[in-house]
């Protein structure tokens, strides 16, 4: 995320400049701040694995996901990228969106260009 933010905020970066000009960007640097503060990799303070809460988030179990989903529903989403990290892997990786009912082959082709 740090690298993406550097590119997006650097006035001298041509890629960042074009993205700022052509796109409305919504970035969530950390979907699980309370869990991260407690040293949790996947679960929030309520003990919910946020990776498994996207289909039916609730205010009680996954308020973080609910807030993000509500914003996505409100503003619409043309493209999303879910970047993950793992202490056992020295690099970040993309998590896929397979299984989403509205996911199309065309979206998949565009998405997997970034792997």
Predicted regions and their residues:
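Active-site/substrate-binding loop(s) of hydrolase catalytic cores
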Residues: 1-115
């Amino acid at each position: 995320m740090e690298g993406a933010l550097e590119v997006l905020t650097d006035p001298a970066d041509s890629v960042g400049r074009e993205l700022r000009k052509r796109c409305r960007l919504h970035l969530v640097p950390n979907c699980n701040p309370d869990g991260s503060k407690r040293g949790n990799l996947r679960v929030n303070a309520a003990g919910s694995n946020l990776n498994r809460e996207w289909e039916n988030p609730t205010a009680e179990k996954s308020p973080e996901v609910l807030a993000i989903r509500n914003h996505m529903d409100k503003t619409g989403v043309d493209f999303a990228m879910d970047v993950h990290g793992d202490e056992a892997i020295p690099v970040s990786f993309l998590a896929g969106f397979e299984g989403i009912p509205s996911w199309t082959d065309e979206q998949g082709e565009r998405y997997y260009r970034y792997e």
